[in-house]
């Protein structure tokens, strides 16, 4: 499982011009899956995202997590995180999980993220052509891979 986590002042996701998910201050999470991903990956990633200390404390030091900051999380599925550009100029998506595998993974990930966060996590529409808008705060942007936990 691979994610891009961005600290935002606001973020939204729209499908066909209609906003289907939005948050204020918090984290925008773009999530991609591969066939080998398991419940262990989902659990680890949900816990890691909620515990990341990406928000400033009263001293201006990034010591607070999204819960401490009273923030929200918006999750958007994004299979392109598993693109390979090693050969040629057209990305290959062969490492990305097929839709019938990745959709249940994404849904379970959002359920775990919501449970860890203690509130509902809005999402985009799986498999749809989506438009994501955000006000990146910092900017603070991280990439995290559950198979390479650095």
Curated annotation (Swiss-Prot):
HAMAP family noted in UniProt: Deacylase_Dtd (MF_00518)
Alphabetical GO biological process terms: D-amino acid catabolic process
Alphabetic keyword roster: Cytoplasm, Hydrolase, RNA-binding, tRNA-binding
Family: Belongs to the DTD family.
Protein name according to UniProt: D-aminoacyl-tRNA deacylase
Organism name: Dechloromonas aromatica (strain RCB)
EC number: 3.1.1.96
GO cellular component terms, semicolon-separated: cytoplasm
Comment field on protein domains: A Gly-cisPro motif from one monomer fits into the active site of the other monomer to allow specific chiral rejection of L-amino acids.
Subunit record text: Homodimer.
A single MF term (Gene Ontology): Ser(Gly)-tRNA(Ala) hydrolase activity
Catalytic activity: glycyl-tRNA(Ala) + H2O = tRNA(Ala) + glycine + H(+); a D-aminoacyl-tRNA + H2O = a tRNA + a D-alpha-amino acid + H(+)
Subcellular location, principal: cytoplasm
């Amino acid at each position: 499982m691979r994610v891009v986590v961005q600290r935002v002042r606001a973020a939204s996701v729209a499908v066909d011009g209609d906003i289907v998910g939005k948050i204020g201050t918090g984290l925008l999470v773009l999530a991609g899956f591969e066939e080998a991903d398991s419940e262990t990956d989902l659990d680890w990633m949900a816990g890691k995202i909620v515990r990341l200390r990406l928000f400033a404390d009263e001293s201006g030091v990034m010591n607070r997590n999204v819960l401490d900051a009273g923030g929200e999380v918006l999750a958007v599925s994004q299979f392109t995180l598993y693109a390979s550009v090693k050969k040629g100029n057209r990305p290959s998506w062969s490492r990305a999980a097929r839709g019938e595998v990745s959709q249940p993974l994404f849904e379970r990930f959002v359920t775990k993220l919501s449970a860890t966060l203690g509130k509902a996590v809005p999402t985009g529409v799986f498999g749809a052509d989506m438009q994501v808008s955000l006000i990146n705060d910092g900017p603070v942007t991280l990439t995290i891979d559950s198979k390479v936990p650095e």
